[in-house]
Curated annotation (Swiss-Prot):
GO cellular component, one term: ribonucleoprotein complex
Subunit comment: Part of the 50S ribosomal subunit.
Similarity field: Belongs to the universal ribosomal protein uL4 family.
GO molecular function, one term: structural constituent of ribosome
HAMAP family to which the protein is assigned, alphabetical: Ribosomal_uL4_B
Cross-referenced InterPro entries: Ribosomal_uL4, Ribosomal_uL4-like, Ribosomal_uL4_dom_sf
Organism of derivation: Aquifex pyrophilus
One Pfam family from the record: Ribosomal_L4
UniProt name for this protein: Large ribosomal subunit protein uL4
Biological function: One of the primary rRNA binding proteins, this protein initially binds near the 5'-end of the 23S rRNA. It is important during the early stages of 50S assembly. It makes multiple contacts with different domains of the 23S rRNA in the assembled 50S subunit and ribosome.
Taxonomic placement: Bacteria, Pseudomonadati, Aquificota, Aquificia, Aquificales
GO biological process, one term: translation
Keyword rRNA-binding on entry: yes
Length: 199
């Protein structure tokens, strides 16, 4: 299969796309991201005495024990959230298949571009980044740019653009690929992308 003038592997850029696999991988990614620091106090943790607030009989009021139970305002919460880890395992095969399918989806919709060079000079400039995207004709698109090596100038030039994310090939993931309308990939990244979906 060819994308522009670049020959790419069919087993990575032209596999059958199954939405359910993509959904599984995205769900797993978002679950891993969750902080899970939510917390509520139970009746044992709220700052109230455990004494009985009124006599059992004789007052005409309903029967009550302590003040910290969940039926009172300011009392504890019954079955409320506690800090927890939302991460769960997903087989590596499924993760790799998901990435292949995400890349294939973009390739089949002509949403991948390969470039020889992404050079924005010595100093980070958002203006230069916008010019670079305009020259490619993708300045209005939501973009994922894959670069071959860490480059502070590129990171800083693009980071002020809300519709652009910059990743190394090793950081390529299903969520970000699907988030973008178009992928701009440096040609030198291709072998490392193959390595990622095989490793």
């Amino acid at each position: 299969m060819k994308i522009g003038d670049v020959e790419v592997r069919d087993d990575v850029f032209n596999v059958k796309v199954k939405k359910h696999v993509l959904w599984e991988v995205v769900k797993w990614q978002l679950a891993k991201r969750r902080q899970g620091t939510h917390s509520t106090k139970t009746r044992g943790e709220v700052a109230y005495s455990g004494r009985k607030i009124l006599p059992q009989k004789g007052t005409g009021n309903a029967r009550h024990g302590e003040r910290g139970v969940n039926i009172f305002v300011g009392g504890g919460v019954a079955h409320g959230p506690k800090p927890r880890d939302y991460e769960y395992p997903l087989p590596k095969k499924v993760r790799k298949l998901g990435l292949k399918m995400a890349l294939s989806d973009k390739a089949q919709n002509d949403a991948i571009m390969f470039v020889d060079n992404i050079d924005l000079g010595e100093q980070p400039k958002t203006k230069k980044a916008v010019e670079f995207l305009k020259n490619l004709g993708v300045d209005k698109e939501t973009l994922l740019i894959v670069i071959p090596e860490k480059n502070e100038v590129l990171y800083k030039s693009f980071r002020n653009l809300q519709n652009v994310r910059v990743l190394l090939p090793e950081g390529l993931n299903v969520y970000d690929v699907l988030w973008a309308n178009k992928l701009v990939i440096h040609k030198e990244c291709l072998d490392r992308i193959y390595k990622k979906v095989e490793a």
